[in-house]
Amino acid sequence: MKIDDTGAGADKSMAASQVGNTTKALYWVAAVTPCDKAGRFDPGAMRAIMEWHKQAGADGIVVLGTTGEFPSFSVAERKQVAKTVLNNKNGLNVIIGPGTPNIAETIDLAHHAEAHGADGLLVIPPFYFNQPPIEGLTAYFSMLFDAVQLPTSLYHYPQTSRVPISFELLKNLKHYPYLAGIKDSSGDPVGYSEFVRTFPDLNMCSGSIKNIGIALENGMGAILGEGNAFSKKCADIFTAYRERGDWRAAIAKLIDAQKAIDDAAADASYSAAQKYILGLEMGMAEIYVRAPYVQLTDAQRSSLKAAFERIKATEK
């Protein structure tokens, strides 16, 4: 891959490989994609949500990931979402998820993100395929790295994608200067610790609140869906870390709050619950999900609202 040694190209390459400082210990919200009742993307709500996270203290947002319901949107719609976000960054570091099962659309979406000023990419492996060989996955990601010059993290979420990011795959791609790291949403502390130990020069971001402690102990970042409902609680963890405060206590507060939400609507989709609590936090109209997810029932809304009010009461 040809690398631009001057200007923005050099800056991006450097950003992908920074080591040995606190630059990597950043907090991104794995942002929801707001829709109206008819299922249409709501640009105004997206801008308001971005400002909310900025004011809460987030370093950035990841758009069109799992919590953002990316498979529910067409390529054209995903470009609309990305363009809306990238035109309204306001100091947030913005990472776009361009992943699809086919490399042509993935590269197309990645090019679009690059052209509109994305700071990076988070790419899920080509899903649905039954145990694709390591050679095929290496070829898929190599084509992406050959086409786009943006810091790019690979998305390890095997419970959902059914295609894990392996150590062998990362080693095969390690020579690409724009390989930034991974997002590990597996929730497996042993596996995540191995990623961190094996690739200390990359940003091995935790996508699970269970592993934020491991991330920060090793100077790594986190990309958190819980940041939708609890943006400030997530930001408080990283503020405490940077200020040498009690960041472990801040993690415990986040875990307790999220457990209360999980218990209140165990049968609701994660995205629907996060959208509902975010709407309550912001005092805005309900933020809807897209099919195949379904909207919350009245009983689920009532239960979530009661849990939310109990959480808020403990903060006073």
Regions found by a protein language model. Give the residues of each.
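Catalytic alpha/beta core domains of metabolic enzymes, predominantly
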Residues: P158-Q258, D262-A266
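Alpha-helical structural signal in soluble globular domains
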Residues: Q80, T84-N88, H112, H116, ...
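A general structural signal for well-ordered alpha-helical segments in protein cores
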Residues: M46, R78, A82, T106, ...
